[in-house]
């Protein structure tokens, strides 16, 4: 597993995303990654809606268990602070969540405030519920609400498939940044396009078939 996360020497900044349900195991994993110099940043993923994960109480289902959520985030933040101090560098921990289980069981407010209190450096909201999975429309107004609620940076996620979507999210929510998920699958150049659009530049033309094939082969 460690070989799967080993970065290219040229990569900076290196980020790794973890998920789990056991605070002690998660803290140990974070410590190992920092001590072996495999990451500069840990993101805790509480956004996965896949049944095989949520049925075990993980992913998007975990924030419903407030005490466990707090224990897990706190354990990883402490582990990264301690391991980072020994390594002589700062290792920020960020948290990704969803709106809640469904429209009747919202968890984002408590989870976001808890993560901030426990020392999370930033929070990402996938603006859908667990039950929505990836269907329907993302509720960007929830991103704006958390942005107003928190003092730490808030990143938006959901329904960003092209540069225009990213600019629209920034304008409508006031979020501090964009997290791209499915929009990058098969289209890694979306990041180039977003950067160009954000800085007022011209979005480069799409890649040729030969370039796409080259990326797939790599």
Regions found by a protein language model. Give the residues of each.
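Glycine-rich, positively charged N-terminal anion/phosphate-binding segment
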Residues: 1-36, 40
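Glycine-rich tight-turn/loop motif centered on a GG-T
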Residues: 12, 51-69, 128-140, 198-203
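Active-site glycine- and acidic-residue-rich loops that bind
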Residues: 24-26, 67, 92-110
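Non-cysteine beta-strand/loop elements that form the S-adenosyl-L-methionine
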Residues: 41-50, 118-127, 180-184
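Short amphipathic alpha-helices and their capping/turn segments at secondary-structure boundaries
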Residues: 25-42, 108-117, 171
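Active-site beta-loop-alpha junctions enriched in small/polar residues
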Residues: 19-21, 47-49, 96-102, 128-130, ...
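Alpha/beta catalytic cores of nucleotide-metabolism and tRNA/nucleoside-modifying enzymes
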Residues: 78-79, 83, 88-89, 104-122, ...
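Hydrophobic faces of well-ordered beta-strands that scaffold small-molecule active sites
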Residues: 14-18, 40-42, 93-97, 125, ...
